[in-house]
UniProtKB/Swiss-Prot annotation:
Coiled coil: none annotated. The active site is at D153. One of its GO terms (biological process) is mitochondrial tRNA pseudouridine synthesis. Signal peptide: none annotated. This is Pseudouridylate synthase RPUSD4, mitochondrial. Interacts with 16S mt-rRNA, mt-tRNA(Phe) and mt-tRNA(Met). Forms a regulatory protein-RNA complex, consisting of RCC1L, NGRN, RPUSD3, RPUSD4, TRUB2, FASTKD2 and 16S mt-rRNA. It comes from Rattus norvegicus (Rat). Belongs to the pseudouridine synthase RluA family. Its EC number is 5.4.99.-. Pfam families: PseudoU_synth_2.
C-alpha cells in the first residue's frame, strides 16, 4: 500500500511531544500559500509598492511640525536645499525659469542659494555641469554649451552672467578684471556698521587657523598698526591682496542692518571678511567668519533668535544672507548702451528682513522704471 501524501485528507503529523499523547492541530495555511508569500514581486506589484513608499515619504515631508522652531527649520531647509539633490535636467529647467535677460550674446540668471558654480571634492552637482543642458533648452539640441563669465560663491545668490560664445565670455571676464563692471550686493548684518557709510580698504590674505580644527580663512592684513598712539606703516606681505569695499546702511535696527556693498576689487570672500573683521558686523548666517578661532554655527543674541523664530541649537540652518543685487555692464559687442540688471531677493532673505524689522529702501522702488532694468520673475 502506497504511503499517504502530505496533502491527503485526514493525515495528522505527530509533534515532538507525541509522547504525551498530544497531536498538532492541522494547519489551515497550505504550503502553496507559503510559497506564494515568498515569491519575488512581479513588475506591477513592485511598481505599486514603490509608489506607496514615495507617497508615504512625500506625506512625511509635507507634514507641518507642531513645534514652531521645527516649522522654522523646515522652512529654511525648503528654501535653501531644494536644488542640491535634483537631476541635472531639473536644475537646468529651474535655471531657465530664473533668466533675467537674454540676447544673442548673453544669458543672465538669478543664481539660487547653495549651488556651487564649479565642481570639486564632495560636489555632486554644480552650475557648470548643466550649462550644456540649459543651452539646448534655450536654443535646441544643436546648441553649444553656455560659458561662465564670472563666479559667485556657493552660498551667494543673485545676478550671474553667462555667454553663448567663448570669445564673448573672455570679453566680459576682462571687464570684471579691469573693474569696469559696477556690482552691488545686499547683506543682512549682525549689528550695525559704524559709521553708516564708508570705505573699507584693508588688504586681505589667506591664513591657516591653528587649533583643534585646523583650517584656512581669509583675514585682514592691515598696512598700518598703532604704536604708542601713533599710526605706523608696516611692511607689506607678498601674500596680501589689495581689497576695497564701499558700503552704505540702507535700513537698521539696534541689532541688525541691511547693507548695500560695492566691491571695487574682487578678492575671495572680500565682503564677508571686510564686514566681519573690518566693521565687526558679520553677515547673518556666516558660520565661517563670525568667529576667527573656530568653525561653528554663528552665535546670535536672544533677541535676534526670537525674531527669527529659532533657538541657538538650530542656528546652523540659517543661510548666508548675501545677495548679488545688481550689475551694470558697459556697452559691449553689438550693444551700444550699458546694461543694468537687477534681481529680487530670495524668499529666505525677504522673510528675514520682515522678521528682523528691516525696511526695503524707498528709492529702490523707483529703480524698476530705469531703462534696461530687468527684474527677476
Amino acid at each position: 500500500m502506497a504511503a499517504p501524501l502530505l496533502g491527503s485528507p485526514g493525515l495528522q503529523v505527530l509533534s515532538m511531544s507525541s509522547r504525551t499523547g498530544k497531536l498538532f492541530t492541522p494547519s489551515s495555511r497550505s504550503f502553496c500559500s507559503r510559497a506564494t508569500s515568498s515569491r519575488p514581486l512581479n513588475a506591477q506589484r513592485l511598481a505599486e509598492k514603490l509608489r506607496a513608499q514615495k507617497q508615504e515619504q512625500k506625506t512625511k515631508e509635507m507634514r507641518v511640525p507642531t513645534n514652531p522652531v521645527q516649522r522654522r527649520v523646515q522652512e529654511l531647509v525648503r528654501f535653501t536645499q531644494q536644488l542640491q539633490r535634483v537631476h541635472p535636467n531639473v536644475l537646468a529647467k529651474e535655471l531657465s525659469r530664473r533668466i533675467l535677460h537674454q540676447d544673442k550674446d548673453l544669458v543672465v540668471i538669478n543664481k539660487p542659494y547653495g549651488l556651487p558654480v564649479h565642481g570639486g571634492p564632495g560636489v555632486q552637482l554644480c552650475i557648470s555641469d548643466v550649462l550644456p543642458i540649459l543651452a539646448k533648452m534655450l536654443h535646441g539640441h544643436k546648441a553649444e554649451p553656455l560659458h561662465l563669465c564670472h563666479r559667485l560663491d556657493k552660498e551667494t545668490t543673485g545676478v550671474m552672467v553667462l555667454a553663448w560664445e567663448k570669445d564673448m565670455a573672455h570679453q566680459v571676464q576682462e571687464l570684471f578684471r579691469t573693474r569696469q563692471v559696477e556690482k552691488k550686493y545686499w547683506a543682512i548684518t549682525v549689528r550695525v556698521p559704524l559709521p553708516s557709510a564708508g570705505v573699507v580698504d584693508i588688504p586681505i590674505m589667506e591664513k591657516e587657523v591653528a587649533g583643534q580644527q585646523q583650517h584656512h580663512k581669509m583675514t585682514l592684513r592691515p598696512s598700518y598698526r598703532m604704536d604708542n598712539g601713533k599710526m605706523v606703516k608696516v611692511r607689506a606681505s607678498r601674500d596680501a591682496h589689495v581689497a576695497v569695499t564701499q558700503y552704505q546702511v540702507l535700513s537698521s535696527t539696534p541689532s541688525s542692518a541691511l547693507v548695500e556693498l560695492q566691491p571695487v576689487t574682487g578678492i575671495k570672500h572680500q565682503l564677508r571678511v571686510h564686514l566681519a573683521f573690518g566693521l565687526d558686523c558679520p553677515i547673518l548666517g556666516d558660520h565661517k567668519y563670525s568667529d576667527w578661532n573656530r568653525l561653528a554655527p554663528q552665535k546670535l543674541s536672544a533677541g535676534t533668535l526670537k525674531k527669527l523664530g529659532l533657538q541657538q541649537s538650530k542656528a546652523r540652518y540659517i543661510p548666508l544672507h548675501l545677495h548679488a543685487r545688481q550689475l551694470i555692464l558697459p556697452a559691449l559687442g553689438s550693444r551700444t548702451e550699458e546694461l543694468l540688471l537687477a534681481c529680487k531677493l530670495p524668499h529666505f532673505f525677504a522673510r528675514s528682513l520682515r522678521r528682523l524689522g528691516l525696511d526695503m529702501p524707498n528709492e529702490d522702488q523707483s529703480r524698476s522704471h530705469e531703462a534696461r532694468h530687468v527684474e527677476a520673475r
